Amino acid sequence: MGLQPLEFSDCYLDSPWFRERIRAHEAELERTNKFIKELIKDGKNLIAATKTLSAAQRKFAHSLRDFKFEFIGDAETDDERCIDASLREFSNFLKNLEEQREIMALSVTETLIKPLEKFRKEQLGAVKEEKKKFDKETERNYSLIDKHLNLSAKKKDSHLQEADIQVEQNRQHFYELSLEYVCKLQEIQERKKFEFVEPMLSFFQGMFTFYHQGHELAKDFNHYKMELQINIQNTRNRFEGTRSEVEELMNKIRQNPKDHKRASQFTAEGYLYVQEKRPPPFGSSWVKHYCMYRKAAKKFTMIPFEHRSGGKLGDGEVFFLKECIRRHTDSIDRRFCFDVEAADRPGISLTMQAFSEEERKQWLEVLGGKEALFPSFNRAIIPRPEGSAQLDKMGFTILRKCIRAVETRGINDQGLYRVVGVSSKVQRLLSMLMDVKTCNEVDLENSVDWEVKTITSALKQYLRSLPEPLMTYELHGDFIVPAKSGSPESRVNAIHFLVHKLPEKNKEMLDILVKHLTNVSNHSKQNLMTVANLGVVFGPTLMRPQEETVAAIMDLKFQNIVVEILIENHEKIFRTPPDATLPEPGPLSAPPNAPPRQSKRQGQRTKRPVAVYNLCLELEDGDRPSLPKEDTPPSSLDSLSSPSPTTATALGHPGPDRNHLLTDGGSFGDWAPTAPSQARSSAVQWLNPQSPTTPSCSPAVTPPSPKLPPVPLSLPATVADKPPESIISRKARAVYPCEAEHSSELSFEIGAIFEDVQTSREPGWLEGTLNGKRGLIPQNYVKLL
């Protein structure tokens, strides 16, 4: 039951029950006062917590904005760029959200805290003052009555009458005060219902506004969120394929590390301990150096390096070798030692220690010592035998039979081309298809003997068994270029142009296959094979680099993008000629007039080695790989859906002349740098047809160059590795800005002054020092002083 009403007539009776009702009203107001006081305190704490949360959110957003993903390789996919930008988008979202939260926090003070404080002080405070007056007047009234009633009846009448009048006046005043107090009590009880709740409504309205703004921000963000989810899924799919390829390459190198040494400008390189002699009585010390030797020039370079000291490079030392002599164990108390004598330091020899006897023999062979008995570090590239799959009439028949069967029987099968068949069945089907006698007998469209997954796996295996990928080794790097940069339209234009540069048979088969893949993607709601999924499956199948490296595997994602572009633009690319009004793509090279680097020369091409899943009908028994048994589970055949790329024609330069993988035996000493082959066409001009060409060391647009005549693989030592004859030591000033694209080159702005400028063995390049760092400078970018 609620509070009983206070009747004004009861003010004159002032009964005990009236007083009880007043005390109940007073207690309720006191409880209300304490509640409002506590609520104000909690509200201020809420504001403080909101500000703390907002500061933490802003700090979190700031951290997101400042972080940037690094990537492996020289470019990112569109998906990766969107993922990189997502952190900034998240940061902006939080920033906008916190701006709304700040507005809400300010409104809490104005709409809740201040009105409640005003109500508590002005209204409840006024009642407290009225209560004090009422209590004081009550005490005074009844004290006066007690005193008046104690007057003796023997007093004079005039005195008694005066006392009666005074008491009556006091009682009237008490009644007036009592009436006002009762009125005030009931007024406050009613007023608090809106004076207190109205600020609460305003407070919640502010909260509703904040949450509505958050909802609107989330609604605006939803489209980006959906796109980002697709980007993440595409990147995850590519990662799964890339990881399996990296692990496969790692296992190959783990099993035969010597068969996978990478080509280098140096005939030999590795760690050696070098004896540093000191004056008596200090003896000598052995310091680890990374040594590099070029046999043709007899140039020996050694750089001190200690892994435990933070990996800092010391000052390098260069000399020209005169002779190398093996140290006998009775002449030194260390094993695996040999002496080298420098031609430019008469009478001075250095004692070096290899890590093992085998390494010492290898160094002695390369350096011209007496124990040249074992194979050296480097290995020549020997092509391995290929499978019997060919791009001929039989190949087109196989392709068309498989495609007809897939489109007739399994166009809606989930995971089409991703689900792999049993290896033995796939090999048997492909063998029958490639045999002229049995090919016509194979009925793929009606026979239940061949599952759809077996047919799709056979189709992919045929394409991977070709001596050269369908999109050719020669154009592999050119197809990768537009996938790494430019707008979507410019990418399509560049790939459109490059497809029409393919050999006619390659283009015809690619047309048939891509048309089929377009049909498959049109049924993606049923088979779940979107364009992105088909790109993951067929990217490594249609495009393979020549060398099997981690850099090549990192380019898998760009191969997938090229295949996606082919599928999405099949009609335009294969049914129309390239736009003649657009400039022909030029080679991806250094800027106009910039000298080429020897370290950027391409090595001689070799055929792709046969992988374990390639068709091996013509291999000798001793070389025949073992095939999985009939009951091999599909999970063991994942390589059928994600074939291993065997190379990468890398566009970046991770190290000097280290972009070629050596796979077979040969003499390291006989190896020499190769001359540049025909300049590769690229799609740079397609990507930025309007951009001006500014001098830069970075790749830029140049006019298409004529084909260069082939140059023999091995160059004479006098040409390839001749030490510099004319050495200058002058200053030079930069006349163009340059951005280095390799760690051995210098970046600089116009007007930079170089010290100690000398000629370099790299034709068209100089060596100089800028700000304490020494490196290569394009000769036509500077003016000698």
Swiss-Prot record:
<dbReference type="InterPro" id="IPR011993">
    <property type="entry name" value="PH-like_dom_sf"/>
</dbReference>
<feature type="compositionally biased region" description="Basic and acidic residues">
    <location>
        <begin position="622"/>
        <end position="632"/>
    </location>
</feature>
<dbReference type="InterPro" id="IPR004148">
    <property type="entry name" value="BAR_dom"/>
</dbReference>
<dbReference type="InterPro" id="IPR027267">
    <property type="entry name" value="AH/BAR_dom_sf"/>
</dbReference>
<dbReference type="Pfam" id="PF00169">
    <property type="entry name" value="PH"/>
</dbReference>
<feature type="compositionally biased region" description="Low complexity">
    <location>
        <begin position="633"/>
        <end position="650"/>
    </location>
</feature>
<dbReference type="InterPro" id="IPR000198">
    <property type="entry name" value="RhoGAP_dom"/>
</dbReference>
<dbReference type="GO" id="GO:0048471">
    <property type="term" value="C:perinuclear region of cytoplasm"/>
</dbReference>
<feature type="domain" description="PH">
    <location>
        <begin position="265"/>
        <end position="372"/>
    </location>
</feature>
<dbReference type="GO" id="GO:0005096">
    <property type="term" value="F:GTPase activator activity"/>
</dbReference>
<dbReference type="InterPro" id="IPR047234">
    <property type="entry name" value="GRAF_fam"/>
</dbReference>
<feature type="domain" description="SH3">
    <location>
        <begin position="727"/>
        <end position="785"/>
    </location>
</feature>
<dbReference type="GO" id="GO:0007165">
    <property type="term" value="P:signal transduction"/>
</dbReference>
<feature type="compositionally biased region" description="Basic residues">
    <location>
        <begin position="598"/>
        <end position="608"/>
    </location>
</feature>
<dbReference type="GO" id="GO:0005829">
    <property type="term" value="C:cytosol"/>
</dbReference>
<dbReference type="InterPro" id="IPR008936">
    <property type="entry name" value="Rho_GTPase_activation_prot"/>
</dbReference>
<keyword id="KW-0343">GTPase activation</keyword>
<keyword id="KW-1003">Cell membrane</keyword>
<comment type="function">
    <text>GTPase-activating protein that catalyzes the conversion of active GTP-bound Rho GTPases to their inactive GDP-bound form, thus suppressing various Rho GTPase-mediated cellular processes. Also converts Cdc42 to an inactive GDP-bound state. Essential for PTKB2 regulation of cytoskeletal organization via Rho family GTPases. Inhibits PAK2 proteolytic fragment PAK-2p34 kinase activity and changes its localization from the nucleus to the perinuclear region. Stabilizes PAK-2p34 thereby increasing stimulation of cell death.</text>
</comment>
<dbReference type="InterPro" id="IPR047225">
    <property type="entry name" value="PH_GRAF"/>
</dbReference>
<keyword id="KW-0963">Cytoplasm</keyword>
<keyword id="KW-0472">Membrane</keyword>
<keyword id="KW-0728">SH3 domain</keyword>
<feature type="region of interest" description="Disordered">
    <location>
        <begin position="576"/>
        <end position="708"/>
    </location>
</feature>
<dbReference type="InterPro" id="IPR001452">
    <property type="entry name" value="SH3_domain"/>
</dbReference>
<dbReference type="InterPro" id="IPR001849">
    <property type="entry name" value="PH_domain"/>
</dbReference>
<feature type="site" description="Arginine finger; crucial for GTP hydrolysis by stabilizing the transition state">
    <location>
        <position position="418"/>
    </location>
</feature>
<dbReference type="InterPro" id="IPR035485">
    <property type="entry name" value="GRAF2_SH3"/>
</dbReference>
<dbReference type="Pfam" id="PF00620">
    <property type="entry name" value="RhoGAP"/>
</dbReference>
<dbReference type="InterPro" id="IPR036028">
    <property type="entry name" value="SH3-like_dom_sf"/>
</dbReference>
<feature type="compositionally biased region" description="Pro residues">
    <location>
        <begin position="584"/>
        <end position="595"/>
    </location>
</feature>
<keyword id="KW-0967">Endosome</keyword>
<feature type="compositionally biased region" description="Polar residues">
    <location>
        <begin position="675"/>
        <end position="697"/>
    </location>
</feature>
<comment type="subunit">
    <text>Interacts with PKN3. Interacts with caspase-activated PAK2 proteolytic fragment PAK-2p34; the interaction does not affect ARHGAP10 GTPase activation activity towards RHOA and CDC42. Interacts via its SH3 domain with PTK2/FAK1. Interacts with PTK2B/PYK2; the interaction negatively regulates ARHGAP10 GTPase-activating activity. Interacts with MICAL1 and WDR44; complex formation might transit from GRAF2/ARHGAP10-MICAL1 to GRAF2/ARHGAP10-WDR44 complexes.</text>
</comment>
<dbReference type="GO" id="GO:0007010">
    <property type="term" value="P:cytoskeleton organization"/>
</dbReference>
<dbReference type="GO" id="GO:0043066">
    <property type="term" value="P:negative regulation of apoptotic process"/>
</dbReference>
<dbReference type="Pfam" id="PF16746">
    <property type="entry name" value="BAR_3"/>
</dbReference>
<protein>
    <recommendedName>
        <fullName>Rho GTPase-activating protein 10</fullName>
    </recommendedName>
</protein>
<dbReference type="Pfam" id="PF14604">
    <property type="entry name" value="SH3_9"/>
</dbReference>
<feature type="domain" description="Rho-GAP">
    <location>
        <begin position="389"/>
        <end position="574"/>
    </location>
</feature>
<feature type="domain" description="BAR">
    <location>
        <begin position="7"/>
        <end position="262"/>
    </location>
</feature>
<dbReference type="GO" id="GO:0010008">
    <property type="term" value="C:endosome membrane"/>
</dbReference>
